[in-house]
Amino acid sequence: AEEAPRRVKLSQRQMQELKEAFTMIDQDRDGFIGMEDLKDMFSSLGRVPPDDELNAMLKECPGQLNFTAFLTLFGEKVSGTDPEDALRNAFSMFDEDGQGFIPEDYLKDLLENMGDNFSKEEIKNVWKDAPLKNKQFNYNKMVDIKGKAEDED
């Protein structure tokens, strides 16, 4: 007998974050994540894994990878994670030398051109609080600032 997937309780915020992640990866907006979506996403991150690696990712999900399947696949991974760690890990993907900094221009370019495409106004709002030094964005400091702000809510 097949095991029923374990139900994972996600907060509204986690659900919203997973929805945003799914939308960002679903480049052709057809409601499914396929091989081309993964290729586009990885190439926009500056890395193109071989097809067999991408196929292995897609094989983790029986059938087509729609949002429900995506939630099942990633919900378990997310539900036990600290949101600050998740944010730090997301930023670290763009930190080429692992020093805790992302070049300001590179980050602005990502915000303007990837996923939900931030407007110039939204970027200006993000930049108000951004810990910048020598045109480098300190994401560890940003995560700490955001974490303290969340605790006060």
UniProtKB/Swiss-Prot annotation:
Residues 13-48, 82-117 form the EF-hand domain. Keywords: Calcium, Metal-binding, Motor protein, Muscle protein, Myosin, Repeat. Ca(2+) binds at residues 26, 28, 30, 37. Pfam families: EF-hand_7. Transmembrane segments: none annotated. One of its GO terms (molecular function) is calcium ion binding. Disulfide bonds: none annotated. InterPro entries: EF-hand-dom_pair, EF_Hand_1_Ca_BS, EF_hand_dom, Myosin_RLC. GO terms for cellular component: myosin complex. The keyword Transcription regulation does not apply. The modification Blocked amino end (Ala) is found at residue 1. In molluscan muscle, calcium regulation is associated with myosin rather than with actin. Muscle myosin contains two types of light chains: the catalytic light chain, essential for ATPase activity, and the regulatory light chain, a calcium-binding protein responsible for Ca(2+) dependent binding and Ca(2+) dependent Mg-ATPase activity. This chain binds calcium. This is Myosin regulatory light chain LC-2, mantle muscle.
